[in-house]
């Protein structure tokens, strides 16, 4: 199992940490939290992932960082997100 950190974007997009909904406090350093709900798992860099017991499970990441991850690229192009 070769694990390459510096893989290209062609690797699996879903394994890269990303977040569509992220909010930060105005403190210094900022406290940022991803509020995006994902099905069955959290993003790859999440340390404290919490999931519901439903099927499929709804998971969210409880980590607090001083930055936001880049928005996730979706499989279909939604250009509307950038307006």
UniProtKB/Swiss-Prot annotation:
Q: Its domain of life?
A: Eukaryota
Per the UniProt record, the site (Reactive bond for chymotrypsin) maps to 53-54
Q: Which InterPro entries match?
A: Bowman-Birk_prot_inh, Prot_inh_BBI
Q: Which Gene3D superfamilies match?
A: Cysteine Protease (Bromelain) Inhibitor, subunit H
* Disulphide bridges: 18-72, 19-34, 22-68, 24-32, 42-49, 46-61, 51-59
From the UniProt record, which GO molecular function terms apply? serine-type endopeptidase inhibitor activity
Q: Which family does it belong to?
A: Belongs to the Bowman-Birk serine protease inhibitor family.
Name of the protein this chain belongs to: Bowman-Birk type seed trypsin and chymotrypsin inhibitor
Question: What SMART domains would the database entry show?
Answer: BowB
Provide the site residues for: Reactive bond for trypsin.
26-27
Coiled-coil residues are none
| Alphabetical keyword list | Disulfide bond, Protease inhibitor, Serine protease inhibitor
Q: Name one GO cellular component term.
A: extracellular region
> Would the keyword Cell cycle be found if you checked this record's keyword annotation?
no
Q: What PROSITE patterns does this protein's entry cite?
A: BOWMAN_BIRK
């Amino acid at each position: 199992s070769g694990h390459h950190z510096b893989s290209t974007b062609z690797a699996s997009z879903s394994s890269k940490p990303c977040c569509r909904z992220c909010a930060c406090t105005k403190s210094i350093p900022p406290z940022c939290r991803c509020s995006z709900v994902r099905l069955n798992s959290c993003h790859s860099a999440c340390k404290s992932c919490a999931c519901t017991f439903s099927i499929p499970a709804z998971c969210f990441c409880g980590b607090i960082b001083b930055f936001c991850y880049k928005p996730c690229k979706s499989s279909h192009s939604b250009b509307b997100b950038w307006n």
